Amino acid sequence: MAVTDPIGDLITRIRNAQMRRKDKTSTPGSRLRASVLEVLRSEGYIRGFTATDHGNGRTEFEIELKYFDGVPVIREIARVSKPGRRVYASVKNLPRVANGLGIAVVSTPQGVMADHEARDKNVGGEVLCTVF
């Protein structure tokens, strides 16, 4: 069955795995998912991820989740821009998550990046999700 919202699916898989205190979870691979996971890894919200090629052009990512004293590092992760309602923000209107303690993952013409990086590069885009 086709997934209509791949980022929403990725977020749900991460949230569900952390509620069950899993060390790892897997998700189908795509370039957009890889970019979002790379932002989460570089910001310290996940330990990392590995890509596995299953042939026929199908890849799968295995995500290593991160915990601190048994508590998930990601307290809250939420989808902002959805297939039915896209949310775009200029550089001036990029959201500040938890008063700067969290991040917003933004898809810009220069690639997928965290909100603070988009502000540094003076570029806006589609707000994919927020993480705290």
UniProtKB/Swiss-Prot annotation:
Keywords: Ribonucleoprotein, Ribosomal protein, RNA-binding, rRNA-binding. It comes from the Bacteria. One of its GO terms (cellular component) is ribonucleoprotein complex. SUPFAM superfamilies: Ribosomal protein S8. Signal peptide: none annotated. GO terms for biological process: translation. Pfam families: Ribosomal_S8. GO terms for molecular function: rRNA binding; structural constituent of ribosome. Belongs to the universal ribosomal protein uS8 family. One of the primary rRNA binding proteins, it binds directly to 16S rRNA central domain where it helps coordinate assembly of the platform of the 30S subunit. Part of the 30S ribosomal subunit. Contacts proteins S5 and S12. PANTHER family: 40S RIBOSOMAL PROTEIN S15A. This is Small ribosomal subunit protein uS8. It comes from Xanthobacter autotrophicus (strain ATCC BAA-1158 / Py2).
